[in-house]
Design a protein with these regions (language model features):
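General structural signal for secondary-structure boundaries
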Residues: 1-3, 42-43
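Local sequence-structure signature of Cys/Sec-based thiol-disulfide redox active-site neighborhoods
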Residues: 2-27, 31-36
Length: 117
């Protein structure tokens, strides 16, 4: 598994995301950093990430964001509707997400990323 590259969906303004990057670097691993706010994943990429995470779209939503509170709070959405919301508003995507091969983890707490190393 040592040759399988790591990718992190990262927001540098997020302390958890920075901590996850540091944990990976401290162990000598190289990682492809994707600033998902500048280069958001497509709807299909989100679906693939969710499959690797073993999560439903609603579980990946950051509910503290203004976009959530203004547009989605109190609403019951289908998985497809949540996927549309995450694709339209990448700020709603919980972070960091670290992917290695066919596995992924949500780095909350950041030490969760160690499961992939």
């Amino acid at each position: 598994m040592g040759d399988i590259p790591l990718r992190i969906y990262h927001n540098n303004r997020c302390s958890k995301s920075r901590a996850a990057c540091q944990l990976i670097a401290d162990r000598g691993f190289e990682v492809e950093v994707v600033d998902y706010l500048k280069t958001p994943p497509s709807r299909d990429e989100l679906r693939a990430l969710l499959d690797k995470l073993g999560m439903k779209p609603a579980e990946l939503v950051r509910r503290g964001e203004a976009v959530f509170k203004e547009n989605y709070a109190g609403r019951s959405l289908s998985d497809d509707e949540w996927l549309d919301a995450l694709a339209a508003h990448p700020i709603l995507i919980e972070r960091p997400i670290v992917v290695r091969g066919e596995r992924a983890v949500l780095g909350r707490p950041p030490e969760k990323v160690l499961e992939l190393l």
